[in-house]
A protein has these predicted regions:
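Conserved Rossmann-fold NAD(P)-dependent oxidoreductase catalytic core, especially the SDR/UDP-sugar
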Residues: 31-35, 39, 81-91, 95-148, ...
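N-terminal Rossmann NAD(P)H-binding glycine-rich loop of SDR-like oxidoreductase domains
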Residues: 6-30
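NAD(P)H-binding glycine-rich loop region in Rossmannoid oxidoreductase-like domains
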Residues: 34-99, 103-106, 195-199
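Glycine/proline-rich active-site loop of Rossmann-fold NAD(P)-dependent oxidoreductases
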Residues: 124, 165-170, 194-203
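Substrate-positioning beta->alpha
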Residues: 97, 138, 156, 178-193, ...
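Flexible, glycine-rich beta-alpha linker
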Residues: 122, 154-175, 207
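Core catalytic loop region at the nicotinamide-binding pocket of NAD(P)H-dependent oxidoreductases
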Residues: 194-218
Length: 223
């Protein structure tokens, strides 16, 4: 476990999971910088316990992203295009994500946590004519690039997200969990726990709602 406060850069800081993550990290004495595209969201993320940083990661090159990342101890990618045109999905969920990995490496920030989705990978099985295909394909490429990097990465892959109250209980694919659903609050808790566990570098955490406390379930996951 990490025994000291970290400086965590959360990309996609106004997303639903990120907004639940920031207060968890702040409560654990970590300093959170929330990257947001819309300056009107600054008050929200400040209320979450994070320091807002306005930047459009979709438009930034690796050099600019390196400046953004530098000075932090960890990066959390929780950004996404949120549907819409496939071209933008690829621009954000694949291209910008990959540039952020390159930036983290250039900035000397080794710890990198990617929020992906349960089932991502070459065998995602989404047909090309499905509206979800662009996202599945973009995530497959981005996740593979992260796994091939020399960063201390962890892939967090929740199943279908809900706004139900968090329970603090999950089940991972390690114990046979199939795709189901999980509250966003529990996803945020998993990310917070993963950040504090260097031993989960190189691990893929696929999970949904279950019966085992998050901390206990993650104890059994190895990188």
């Amino acid at each position: 476990m990490v025994g000291h406060p970290m400086r965590v850069l959360v990309i996609g800081g106004h997303g639903k999971v990120a907004r639940l993550l920031s207060p968890l990290l702040a409560d654990r004495s970590h300093a959170v910088t929330a990257v947001i595209r819309d300056p009107d969201h600054a008050a929200d993320v400040t209320a979450d316990g994070a320091t807002p940083l306005v930047a459009d990661v979709e438009a930034m090159d690796v050099a600019a992203l390196t400046d953004l990342v530098r000075g932090h101890d960890a990066v959390v990618w929780s950004a996404g295009a949120g549907g819409g045109k496939p071209s933008r999905t690829y621009a954000v969920d694949r291209d910008a994500a990959i540039r952020s990995m390159e930036a983290a490496r250039a900035a000397g920030v080794d710890r990198y946590v990617m929020v992906s989705y349960f089932g991502a990978g070459p065998d995602h099985g989404v047909p090309q004519d499905d509206p979800f295909y662009a996202y599945a394909d973009a995530k497959t490429t981005a996740d593979a690039r992260l796994e091939a990097s020399d960063l201390a990465w962890t892939l967090v892959r929740p199943s279908r997200l809900t706004d139900d109250d968090p329970t603090g209980l999950i089940e991972t694919s390690r114990t046979g969990a199939g795709t189901g659903s999980v509250p966003r609050g529990d996803v945020a808790l998993v990310v917070a726990e993963v950040l504090e566990r260097p031993g989960l570098a190189g691990a893929v955490v696929e999970f949904n709602a279950g019966d085992t406390p998050v901390e206990q379930e993650l104890d059994a996951v190895t990188g």
